[in-house]
């Protein structure tokens, strides 16, 4: 969970998207690094009006942000590849404040498994993922 007062150095990964899979609304919210996620997290799939909770999610990426990113979980219920098409980079450096964020937009492909075991094939769902490093 996030907190009202963040530490001076904070780094997180976050991804979010909504589209359709098999003609039904599908969405996800995935993140790691923001706050204490040992007891709860923001990782969730949404499909056809129902939510499906995920555990810990990993973001595997290269230092060259335009290369594909892999997002997967510990339980084998999520395995997505983001193929970026645009890097929206923001950078702010003033005195001791030093913030940098790469928001990558592109297509997500792979699979997601719902609570009942249903496997969804994701094919080029347009969404984003970001890597933020903040010193504030």
Tell me what each language-model feature is.
Residues 1-136:
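Structured soluble/peripheral alpha/beta segments that form catalytic or ligand/cofactor-binding pockets
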């Amino acid at each position: 969970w996030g907190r009202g007062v963040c530490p001076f150095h904070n780094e997180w990964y976050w991804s979010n998207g909504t589209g359709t899979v098999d003609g039904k609304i599908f969405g996800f919210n995935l993140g790691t690094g923001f706050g204490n996620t040992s007891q709860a997290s923001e990782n969730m799939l949404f499909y056809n009006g129902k939510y499906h909770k995920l555990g810990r999610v990993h973001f595997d990426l290269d230092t060259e942000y335009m290369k594909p990113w892999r997002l997967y979980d510990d339980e084998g219920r999520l395995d997505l590849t983001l193929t970026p098409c645009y890097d929206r980079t923001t950078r702010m450096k003033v005195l001791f404040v030093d913030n940098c964020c790469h928001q990558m937009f592109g297509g997500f492909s792979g699979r997601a498994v719902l609570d009942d075991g249903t496997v969804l094939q994701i094919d080029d769902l347009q969404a984003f993922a970001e890597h933020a490093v903040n010193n504030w």
